[in-house]
Amino acid sequence: MAPSLGSGSTRILLIVSLLLCLRQQAVVDAAIVEHTFHVGNLTVERLGQRQVITAVNGQFPGPKVEARNGDTLLVRVVNNSPYNITIHWHGVLQRLSAWADGPAMVTQCPILPGSGAGSSYTYRFNVTGQEGTLWWHAHVSFLRATVYGALLIRPRPGVPYPFPAPHAEHTLLLGEWWNASATLVDVERQAFLTGGQPANSVALTINGMPGLSHAHKEMHHLRVARGNTYLLRLVNAALNYQLFFKVAAHNFTVVAVDACYTDPYHTDVIVIAPGQTVDALMHAGAAPGRRYYVAAQVYQSIANATYSATARALLRYDDDAKDAAKTIIMSPRMPVLNDSATAQRFYGSLTGLLRDGKPTVPQRVDTRMVVTYGLAIAPCLPAQTLCNRTRGSLAASMNNVSFQLPATMSLLEASRSRSSGVYTRDFPDRPPVMFDFTNAAAVNRNMSLMVTSKGTRVKALRYNETVEVVLQNTAVLGTENHPLHLHGFNFYVLAQGTGNYYYLIRKKKIRKNLVNPQQRNTIAVPPGGWAVIRFTADNPGVWLMHCHLEAHLPFGLAMAFDVQDGPTPDAMLPPPPNDYPPC
């Protein structure tokens, strides 16, 4: 007798059949997205000056890459520029594709200039399980000042956003601009030779335009229809500055950060650090008969800093007056440049959106680390010919290790080939000495706390190990907000605040959010403060964690995690592709 429709065996068969159908449908829905990036020189004019920059496909900013959750991307990069180049896919998890992550001398050697061997490389990676706004950028020298673009990952066909569907969207890339007499590579080179800070940019940009002229010639324009709701996709591609972002007479609902959905957060100002992205809904319902400035302004977390800049774009309604000369333009009221209270209120108010079937915070912790970081002083290198050898060279460190990139082989290649002499697996779990990290007066009286040494030391992790890291900012040579980016993973932000973490934890003044913390790939650790992050090391490879203030990476404000293979083939990193760039 055949089993009834309600029997256990039939239900199991139906469930298995349904799962197979869903899996097959997901495969059908997934696509292969292909692009070719030609990197080369481009002459542009900004602020009344013609300048040669490095760009992709003759565009600044570079081309927008669009995909859907589950797609595979193949991006062939051809280097026609005079410089070594790599491309990093910022925020892409690179599951089992660490060879495509992109940081020079970490996961690959650079793509060489010219037309010979090693002058092109195809980045191959999948974006299953990711949705939202990410971006791509050069990961060599200061080239990312002009070599960058948006990477948008939409839900699978037929899958809605977990927020009200917008009528349309605008992608806004926020950047910096140098009117350099030489090139940006020379700006970094000069800083290296002197052992000091690089020259400041002269302007901020929105989609490559500074928007400083009242004639609006060099200004990005946004068109909106009254009554519609728009998804603003914001990317901070600036090299060295966090930014306040506002639109005059408009408010936002933040729905995602770093391509991770959040609970809706209502605000009139967005704070965004270099490397971070924000997705926010904006309703176009302002008063008619006006136009509205969109503004991105420097947020200075350094005490006594005076440098400020603002970029502007222009928001126009479809029904505004045709006579622009008679139209009132409204400007947003921006925070003061050092308004850390507004910054921390924004960052501290975000929580993660809980969704059925999606990962939650790992409750067990296998490894706990305390990573202190900040600026430091190191002896001048022989090649630093303009460095003051009495004073020393400006440096930076994590747990008093100033990270040095290898010169002959990438860290990932060295790890996989078990090559010796390239790096060591002994990055410390704690700083060499515990002190009152944020007491500037005490710290800067102790010269021993300012001196660091170079090293290429990484932290080895077992596959699937859960790691909790206390990121403690220090007051050595000043306090500022360092945005730290972790490659290869999203992490949960369990808590963040100002002061000395260990003093506060002893006083039981810290409460970790283990229910719905925000997820990120880049965290702006508060000036003179700390953050607690947690992630699971379920992605084999070598993954950089570094400050996304571009000047601080060559100073040494970085470290790396070397994650071992898992026990099964689907948890093991495949060999490098055939066109993997040689050193």
From Swiss-Prot:
GO terms for cellular component: apoplast. PROSITE patterns: MULTICOPPER_OXIDASE2. CDD domains: CuRO_1_LCC_plant, CuRO_2_LCC_plant, CuRO_3_LCC_plant. Its EC number is 1.10.3.2. Residues 1-30 form the signal peptide. Pfam families: Cu-oxidase, Cu-oxidase_2, Cu-oxidase_3. Cu cation 2 binds at H90, H137, H548. Cu cation 3 binds at H139, H487, H546. The keyword Transmembrane helix does not apply. It is an enzyme of class 1 (oxidoreductase). Residues 38-158, 168-320, 426-567 form the Plastocyanin-like domain. Cu cation 4 binds at H482, C547, H552. Cu cation 1 binds at H88, H485. One of its GO terms (molecular function) is hydroquinone:oxygen oxidoreductase activity. Glycans are attached at N41, N84, N126, N179, N251, N304, N338, N388, N400, N446, N464. Keywords: Apoplast, Copper, Glycoprotein, Lignin degradation, Metal-binding, Oxidoreductase, Repeat, Secreted, Signal. GO terms for biological process: lignin catabolic process. Binds 4 Cu cations per monomer. It is found in: Secreted, Extracellular space, Apoplast. Its cofactor is Cu cation. Lignin degradation and detoxification of lignin-derived products. Belongs to the multicopper oxidase family. This is Laccase-14. It comes from Oryza sativa subsp. japonica (Rice). The gene is LAC14.
